UniProtKB/Swiss-Prot annotation:
It catalyses: N,N'-diacetylchitobiose + H2O = N-acetyl-beta-D-glucosaminyl-(1->4)-D-glucosamine + acetate; diacetylchitobiose-6'-phosphate + H2O = N'-monoacetylchitobiose-6'-phosphate + acetate. The lineage of its organism: Bacteria, Pseudomonadati, Pseudomonadota, Gammaproteobacteria, Enterobacterales. Involved in the degradation of chitin. ChbG is essential for growth on the acetylated chitooligosaccharides chitobiose and chitotriose but is dispensable for growth on cellobiose and chitosan dimer, the deacetylated form of chitobiose. Deacetylation of chitobiose-6-P and chitotriose-6-P is necessary for both the activation of the chb promoter by the regulatory protein ChbR and the hydrolysis of phosphorylated beta-glucosides by the phospho-beta-glucosidase ChbF. Its cofactor is Mg(2+). It comes from Escherichia coli O9:H4 (strain HS). This is Chitooligosaccharide deacetylase.
Length: 249
């Protein structure tokens, strides 16, 4: 039986270099899906590029760790800006869950305003939606809106009955050792688990000033090279995978 493979590029809207990399990986590679940061500095550029690439499925990359929120979040911001101190708040069980709930709804409405349609699915920047305190909020919201959600089933969360997600999710195509063999190993591992549907996360980009400031910089360019490799699409098909998006889940 044919298996579904979703290759999702995170960070659409982060920068122009990121946006161009994602479009290139869709147009000339195997990326089928992306998730957009509605508060990203290059989100308007991302919207513009997406109009010329209708085959690219676009979901929402919920942001709680970067930039300015769309709502007042005094319990999570410092000087009006979001940051990685959210991990400390989570450890202290001090997350402002009502503020997070309101921000999620606001980012969702902003996505629809920008792209003119609902996102195909939800995930989050730095995987914050997988925090045990936050996941029930996001899962319930996705189910209510009728959209899919990136979920790591190994986390063993209780999922809403009507929530759509893939059987498998992998973030292993990441780091300093990016290669075609690594990507194919991710598929083989999922096959051994018996996953009938799989999302693989990626971050293809061209380098610009914003990406240069990221702790994860040059591997994004290597990812782009691998994801547009002439041989990769054939190797994926040989393993019994069909490229698709969360529309197919």
């Amino acid at each position: 039986m044919e298996r579904l493979l979703i290759v999702n590029a995170d960070d659409f809207g982060l920068s122009k270099g990121q946006n161009y990399g994602i479009i290139e990986a869709c147009r000339n590679g195997i990326v089928t899906s992306t998730t957009a940061l509605v508060n990203g500095q290059a989100i308007d550029h991302a919207v513009q590029l997406s109009r010329d690439e209708p085959s690219l499925a676009i979901g929402m990359h919920f942001v709680l760790t970067m930039g300015k929120p769309l709502t007042a979040m005094p319990g999570l911001t410092r000087d009006g800006v979001l940051g990685k101190w959210i991990w400390q708040l989570a450890e202290e069980d001090a997350l402002p869950l009502e503020e997070i709930t309101q921000e999620l709804a606001s980012q969702y409405l902003r996505f629809i305003e920008l792209f003119g349609r609902k996102p195909t699915h939800l995930d989050s920047h730095h995987h914050v939606h997988m925090f045990p305190q936050i996941f029930p909020i996001v899962a319930r919201f996705a189910a209510e809106q009728g959209i899919a959600l990136r979920a790591d089933r190994q986390m063993a969360f209780d999922l809403p009955v009507n929530l759509r997600t893939t059987q498998g999710f992998s973030s292993a195509f990441y780091g300093e050792e990016i290669s075609e063999s690594l990507f194919l190993q991710v598929l083989d591992d999922a096959g051994h688990r018996g996953d009938r549907s799989l999302e693989v996360m990626c971050h293809p980009a061209f380098i610009d000033n914003t990406i240069r400031q990221s702790a994860y910089c040059f591997p994004r360019l290597t990812e782009l090279d691998v994801l547009t490799s002439a041989s990769l699409k054939g190797a994926i098909a040989q393993r019994g995978y069909r490229l698709g998006s969360y529309r197919d889940v």
